[in-house]
Amino acid sequence: VLLGYERCGTYTRDARNPRCGDATFGVQPATNVGRISDFIEYAGRIRGAQKAKQALALVRDNAWSPMEAIVAALALLPMSEGGYGLGDVALNRRQLTAPELVSLGCKDSRVPDIELVGTHVGFNYDGRVHFAVGESGTGQDGGADAASVRAKYLDDLRRNRELAAMGRVVLPVTSEDLFQQSGLDAVMLEAVLIAEELDHIEDGRFDELKALIGMPVLQRERQRVIWSLLPWEPGDAYARQIADQLARAGHPREIVTTVMDI
């Protein structure tokens, strides 16, 4: 799934250390979900095609960063598999700012990282801004670093205000939300409650999440899935634990390598 986001996004992971290595940003997407889907259909019964099709259902075009991709995948992943089952999402769709605000100096558009399709709610991954503030000022260009961090912080605040003026509530997601037990659970439930209040959603799409989000056994398993995806060394161990658990439960444990030159 995460490889799909990378191939269809504007970043690449370190080929030698994809989990913890540095990512490169601002690259052209290698392909897109539609073209991969066409290839899978063309491949027919080739080994791994069905597994690839299942994975592709959780991939969306135009992710701008690995962490954004992780949050999007978890939002799409069913609760039975350790995700949140929030329905469809869209990534980095540009929203035009009201002309009246642009005339007062606001940016002419803003781009929320993730939107819950059919709602006015979304997410922005804001990373480790406060750590950067604490670390800036220690080097030769500390003053410039601190000013840059401050400018980014202020722009994030203005971004959220301007999106709110467009009728969109965009919740920040931090690295602490992902690493802390049930931290992301709280953010996702907040998004659901806002969507129900703001968009008057009554189709039951969020009923499962609200019913199951507080169950301790599911919270623990879901957090283990989250930890298995994150860019830190223990992630490999959590991923192996989950694979071993699936194998013991009778799921086939296989690694399918498919080279797709689309």
Where are these regions (language model features)?
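Hydrophobic alpha-helical segments and helix pairs
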Residues: 1-27
